[in-house]
């Protein structure tokens, strides 16, 4: 899944944010 900055994303969901794998929300 892809992520956007703002909310917590599941661990491992860091397609667009490899430097912040726990930041962002799923926008898949």
UniProtKB/Swiss-Prot annotation:
Its EC number is 3.2.2.22. It is an enzyme of class 3 (hydrolase). It catalyses: Endohydrolysis of the N-glycosidic bond at one specific adenosine on the 28S rRNA. Keywords: Hydrolase, Protein synthesis inhibitor, Toxin. GO terms for biological process: negative regulation of translation. GO terms for molecular function: rRNA N-glycosylase activity; toxin activity. Inhibits protein synthesis in animal cells. Does not possess ribonuclease activity. Belongs to the ribosome-inactivating protein family. This is Ribosome-inactivating protein pleuturegin. It comes from Pleurotus tuber-regium.
């Amino acid at each position: 899944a892809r992520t956007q900055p703002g909310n917590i994303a599941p661990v491992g969901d860091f397609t667009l944010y490899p430097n912040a794998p726990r930041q962002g929300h799923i926008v898949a």
